[in-house]
Amino acid sequence: MKMSWESLKKWPPNVFALTSSLLAESGAYRLAVSPPKGKVWPRNPDFWTAELPDIANKVRAYAVGRDSAPPAFRKCWESLEKGKGLGVDSLVKPRQWKTCESILYLHAIADEACRGLGVPTGWPMSTAAEVDFSIRAYYLLSRHGTLANINPDLVRVLPKLHTPQVGATLRSFSHHLTTTASEVSINWQLVPSGLRPDRETINVMLFPFPYEIRPTDFKGVGESSFFQFSSAQSLNVGRIVRLIEEGRSRVGAIDMIVFPEASLSCRDLSRLQGRLRKEVQMPIILAGVRKPPSGGTLGSNYAEFIVRISERALYSGKQYKHHRWCLDDVQIRQYHLGSALDPNHHWWEGIQIERRELNFIPLTDAITICPLICEDLARQEPVAEVVRAVGPTLVIALLLDGPQMAARWPSRYATVLADDPGSSVLTLTSLGMALRSRPQGKEPARLVALWKDRKTGLLEIELPPRKEAIILTVCREWREEWTADYRGDGGSAATPFLAGIEPIGLD
């Protein structure tokens, strides 16, 4: 798909896609922190605060045909056009500094012009041009999973919520936009969640169901090396509703309920949402769902997200697991599954591998959730690159795993995401699976969840005896983040942190 330079110039996300490609392929972004001898970047130390915001406002108006291109933007674009015949590698050479400098300016201008996209209220829209710009941007994002009108198979331009505060990669030089070039499709919908965009706290209720898992819940599939998991414990919907009511009596509103990986059958989820949708204050549901094999095809393992948007309408989105779990000899013995699965073989989870997709779910201006399923937290490809690029404020990993201890693998990967890009991370497993994990010499542990954020650090979360759910009160802190070339974001980066834990039971 070819686009004219004029078409690229008129839409900031397109400009950002172009500058990102040039800076990444040439490695010239490093010159922003190590300019050639005798050069400085930016040329005017006050450019970020004194000039850039006004230029970005005018570029937004230009993008929707309500103003002409501002002189500073036009001058940089003309310089870039003059360098069209140059090889990309030449951008790092001192004699091409003027062209490289123009690309760096255009990169920052396009980034600043897209401030606030991707969250419910975003940047205050005080002019008709800003309203037009936001409507067009959200249309592209919701329909095509990209802010650019460039073929997403080539590149996607996405909103960005965190800027890495360590290291120096291309991601370190933008606050509001990022690019990805991968097979992963993006679903980013601004769904009316019922939460005020400026809400300071939300209450998330965790159900570590099933509470018991037996070896017979794991079965081989025919003569193959696949296994199927299906819990024998049925979901008591009435009891879940009573637990939610008990939670409300203790903390007030319950904004969201979460179930671990593969914890619910399709029928369980249907019965649960059917019961809850009758409520005016139906909580948002994020659940790990399993679907059995059918018609000669393998089953499915996915996360489903459900929001009540009106009295008659629900929004529902699915995200399928991207990697199969492999149960080897060590894990079969760790979870004491030898009576169901032969430890002399490797057993692979019997699920279809669907098209790779990531969901980003903005609940408030401060909390945008990205759900992951078990191995997807640990495997670097194909989704980890996209998660790091966007920097969602809260990653929720649904697991079918052992106890959530600081020494185990979920903690390691949560720490990586908390450091770069700066996301807060919640992991949740079932009590049944946590108690099945009994390595030699270790006592069973009721650690069903783990939380990691930059403000309060790492916390193991235990489900006490006689309790069936845990309510987490999540607050948010606004921080100023800086690009590697010292451009601040005005304190628009949010860090969700844990401010309260309330175990819930029906004593």
Features from the language model and the residues they span:
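Cys-nucleophile CN-hydrolase/nitrilase-fold catalytic domain and related Cys-dependent amidase chemistry
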Residues: 234-321, 410-415, 419
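A short C-terminal boundary segment appended to hydrolase-like catalytic domains
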Residues: 469-507
